[in-house]
């Protein structure tokens, strides 16, 4: 069996807060099936601990799927049942960065992932 990989495209978006809000994500990740990946979303231009951070998935030709959200003030999380056990959301308040770890990656995880407030 040949070598295969999974491509995760990462995009950040901010809506309805302030025009100077920025969410920065790396452009893409290339990982092997079965592996895990931890992706980041660095926030600036607003009070990081005041807003829920949401994560969303979009596969080619499909609609948006809400993965879950985390509140940076206390790390309270809510997950879409479908992504429980697949995604783990965390934050680092000191760097205003949110993280999403995806485990046991398969071809179904190849998608664009958005962080959003």
Curated annotation (Swiss-Prot):
Transmembrane segments: none annotated. One of its GO terms (cellular component) is extracellular region. Keywords: Adaptive immunity, Disulfide bond, Immunity, Immunoglobulin, Signal. PROSITE patterns: IG_LIKE. Residues 50-54 are annotated as: Complementarity-determining-1. Residues 55-68 are annotated as: Framework-2. It holds the Pfam family V-set. The keyword Transmembrane helix does not apply. SMART domains: IGv. Disulfide bonds join 41-115. InterPro entries: Ig-like_dom (IPR007110), Ig-like_dom_sf (IPR036179), Ig-like_fold (IPR013783), Ig_V-set (IPR013106), IgHV (IPR050199). Residues 20-49 are annotated as: Framework-1. Residues 1-19 form the signal peptide. Residues 86-117 are annotated as: Framework-3. This germline gene belongs to a set of closely related genes that could encode V regions of NPb antibodies. This is Ig heavy chain V region 102. Residues 69-85 are annotated as: Complementarity-determining-2. SUPFAM superfamilies: Immunoglobulin (SSF48726). GO terms for biological process: immunoglobulin mediated immune response. It comes from the Eukaryota. One of its GO terms (molecular function) is antigen binding.
